[in-house]
């Protein structure tokens, strides 16, 4: 989506890869792009590592199991450098969605990085 916003029109990417597989269209739909153009003021991007940290933080701290795509909003608020912009704008709401995460993926996310890094 960021490439499309920058270009001012929907852009087709050659390849996309992320732990957040639900956020990986190679091209945003025309209607989605139109809505983003009209209603979105700012975009904060997050890394896969920040998303993984958010998945782990949500599970350990909030006792919520959220798939990586659904944890991207929490990653922006909790860990992304752009999240600091949110602190100056008053109340922030992060919608969490999706429990579509397998036990195997959840275990692998915890195995990839040290658990203490999200506490």
What do the predicted segments below correspond to?
Residues 1-39, 83-119:
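Glycine-rich phosphate/pyrophosphate-binding loop at beta-loop-alpha junctions
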Residues 29-89:
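Active-site-adjacent helical/loop segments in soluble small-molecule enzymes
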């Amino acid at each position: 989506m960021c490439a499309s916003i920058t270009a001012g029109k929907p852009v087709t990417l050659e390849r996309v890869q992320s732990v957040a597989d639900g956020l990986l269209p190679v091209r945003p739909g025309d209607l989605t792009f139109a809505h983003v153009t009209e209603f979105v003021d700012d975009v904060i991007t997050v890394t896969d590592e920040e998303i993984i940290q958010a998945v782990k933080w949500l599970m350990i701290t909030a006792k919520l199991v959220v798939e990586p795509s659904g944890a991207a909003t929490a990653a922006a608020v909790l860990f992304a450098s752009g999240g600091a912009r949110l602190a100056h704008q008053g109340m922030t709401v992060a919608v969490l969605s999706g429990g579509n995460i397998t036990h195997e993926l959840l275990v692998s996310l915890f195995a990839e990085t040290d658990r203490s890094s999200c506490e």
